[in-house]
C-alpha cells in the first residue's frame, strides 16, 4: 500500500466531496452514505469495510453490550444471504479465500472482508443486504448469548481485563464509557430481542455509516455497485438518538481494589484526557511512549530493570469523547502495590517538573514513524486504522495526525504532563491475587 492513487471519476447517484493523500471521499445522493476509496490497481486483493457510527457509548443500562450482541446476530443471515438458501457469508466468501469478520468498540462497529479483488462485488452486495435486512431472531439470540457470555467470563478470569473494567467503571460515573463493550452479565443474558431489534432500527442506516474500500479495484465500477446495492436503502426517517451525557468534573482521586483468585498482582493508574480530535492528544501520545515504550523508556527502567515489575505499559486512548491515559504494571513476586503506585506517580511528577530529554523525544518519534508506516501495510491494516479515525469523528486524521505527532516538542510533553497527570484527577486500581483453592 505504499503507492497512492487517486482516480477521481463521476458516477451518477454519487457526489464527489474531496481527495486527501490518495483517499477519495464521495456521498451517496439518495441516502447520505459516506464512501472512502483508496485504490492500488496493482494489488491482487481488495478490502471492504462498513463502519457504523454506533458503539457501546450509545447503549444504556438494560441493554449494555447490545452493539456487540448484534454483531454476532448479524452473521446469522439476512434477507438474501442465509443458511436456508445456502448463501451464508461463510459459504460465499470464506470458501473463496476471504478474511471475514467484525469488531465492536466504544464509538463504532465495523464489518469487513479482505478478498481476491474479483469478489469485491459480492462483499458489497452482502453488506448492503444485512444493513437493513439482517435476521434479528430470538432463537439466534439465545444461542449467541451463551457465546457472548463465555467471552464475558473469559474476561472476568483475566486479571488485566477485570481490573481495566473496574477502572473505567469508576473513572466514569455518568458517561457510557462507564461500561465495557461486552456489557454487564445480566444485560447479556436478559436483553429482550425486541430491544435488540429496536437498537438495530435506531442506528443501522446508510446515513449513519461509512463504506471504505482499499486495494485492487476500479473506482467507477465500485461506485456503481455501491449505488446499485446500498442505494436501495433510504436514509433513516427522523433523528438519531443523540448521546448527550457528559461526564461531570472529577473532584478527587478515586480508588478500587479487585481481589480474587489469580497468580498476578497489578496496579493501574488512569487520568482523564480530552477527546481524540483535541490538539493536546499528539503530545499525550508522545508522553505515553516516553513513559513505557520499550526497554529504554522511563517506567521500564524504573520498574522492570529493578525487578519490581515484570511488565509495564502506558496507553493514551483516542475516543470520540474525553478518554483516559492509563499505565498498567504487572508486579513481580512480593512487590508491594503501594511501591509501584508511588514510583509511577514519581515518574509523572518528574516529567511535569523537569520535562523530557531530546533523546527521549527523538526515540518516541522514531517509534511513531514505524507505527505510521504500518498503517498502510496491507488492506486490513489500512481499513482498521482509517476506521478508528472515522469513529473519532474525523477520517482525515488518518492523513493529518501523523504530521502532528512528529511536530510535538519537549515543551508540549511537559505541559500536558503538568496539565493532565494530576492526582486529584486520577483513578487508581489494584488487582490483588488471592490464593487459588
Residue map of PLM features:
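Short, polar/flexible loop-turn hinges at active-site or ligand-entry regions and domain interfaces
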Residues: 76-83, 131-139, 356
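Short, glycine/charge-rich beta-strand/loop segments that flank catalytic centers
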Residues: 104-112, 139-150
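M16 family metallopeptidases and their MPP-like homologs
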Residues: 38, 43-59, 65-69, 84-130, ...
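Generic structural signal for individual residues within well-ordered alpha-helical segments
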Residues: 121, 142, 189, 197, ...
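Histidine-acidic residue clusters that define the catalytic metal-binding segment
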Residues: 5-26, 169-209, 241-247, 284, ...
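His/Glu-rich zincin catalytic helix
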Residues: 1-88, 112-115, 125-127, 198-305, ...
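Short, conserved secondary-structure transition motifs
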Residues: 149-155, 245-260, 366-375
Amino acid at each position: 500500500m505504499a503507492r497512492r492513487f487517486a482516480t477521481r471519476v463521476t458516477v451518477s447517484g454519487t457526489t464527489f466531496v474531496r481527495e486527501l493523500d490518495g483517499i477519495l471521499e464521495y456521498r451517496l445522493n439518495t441516502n447520505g452514505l459516506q464512501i472512502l476509496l483508496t485504490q492500488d490497481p496493482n494489488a491482487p486483493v481488495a478490502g471492504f469495510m462498513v463502519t457504523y457510527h454506533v458503539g457501546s457509548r450509545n447503549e444504556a443500562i438494560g441493554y449494555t453490550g447490545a452493539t456487540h450482541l448484534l454483531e454476532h446476530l448479524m452473521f446469522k443471515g439476512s434477507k438474501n444471504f442465509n443458511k436456508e438458501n445456502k448463501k451464508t457469508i461463510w459459504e460465499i466468501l470464506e470458501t473463496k479465500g476471504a478474511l471475514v469478520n467484525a469488531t465492536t468498540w466504544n464509538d463504532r462497529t465495523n464489518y469487513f472482508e479482505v478478498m481476491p479483488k474479483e469478489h469485491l462485488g459480492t462483499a458489497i452486495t452482502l453488506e448492503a443486504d444485512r444493513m437493513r435486512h439482517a435476521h434479528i431472531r430470538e432463537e439466534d439470540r439465545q444461542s449467541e448469548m451463551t457465546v457472548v457470555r463465555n467471552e464475558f467470563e473469559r474476561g472476568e478470569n483475566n486479571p488485566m481485563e477485570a481490573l481495566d473494567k473496574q477502572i473505567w467503571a469508576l473513572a466514569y460515573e455518568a458517561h457510557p464509557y462507564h461500561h465495557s463493550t461486552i456489557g454487564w452479565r445480566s444485560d447479556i443474558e436478559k436483553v429482550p430481542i425486541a430491544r435488540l431489534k429496536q437498537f438495530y432500527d435506531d442506528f443501522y442506516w446508510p446515513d449513519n455509516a461509512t463504506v471504505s474500500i482499499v486495494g485492487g479495484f476500479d473506482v467507477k465500477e465500485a461506485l456503481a455497485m455501491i449505488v446499485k446495492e446500498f442505494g436501495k436503502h433510504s436514509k433513516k426517517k427522523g433523528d438519531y438518538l443523540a448521546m448527550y451525557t457528559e461526564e461531570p468534573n472529577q473532584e478527587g482521586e478515586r480508588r478500587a481494589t479487585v481481589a480474587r483468585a489469580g497468580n498476578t498482582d497489578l496496579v493501574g493508574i488512569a487520568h482523564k484526557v480530552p477527546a481524540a480530535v483535541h490538539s493536546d492528544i499528539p503530545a499525550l501520545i508522545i508522553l505515553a511512549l516516553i513513559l513505557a515504550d520499550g526497554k529504554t523508556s522511563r517506567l521500564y527502567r524504573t520498574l522492570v530493570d529493578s525487578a519490581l515489575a515484570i511488565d509495564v505499559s502506558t496507553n493514551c486512548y483516542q475516543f470520540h469523547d474525553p478518554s483516559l491515559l492509563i499505565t498498567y504494571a504487572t508486579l513481580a513476586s512480593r512487590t508491594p502495590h503501594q511501591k509501584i503506585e508511588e514510583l509511577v506517580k514519581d515518574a509523572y511528577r518528574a516529567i511535569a517538573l523537569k520535562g523530557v530529554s531530546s533523546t527521549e523525544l527523538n526515540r518516541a518519534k522514531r517509534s511513531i514513524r514505524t507505527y505510521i508506516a504500518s498503517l498502510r501495510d496491507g488492506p486490513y491494516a489500512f481499513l482498521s486504522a482509517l476506521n478508528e479515525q472515522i469513529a473519532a469523528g474525523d477520517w482525515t486524521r488518518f492523513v493529518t495526525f501523523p504530521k502532528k505527532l512528529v511536530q510535538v516538542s519537549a515543551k508540549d510533553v511537559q505541559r500536558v504532563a503538568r496539565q493532565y497527570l494530576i492526582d486529584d484527577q486520577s483513578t487508581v486500581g489494584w488487582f490483588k491475587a488471592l490464593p487459588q483453592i
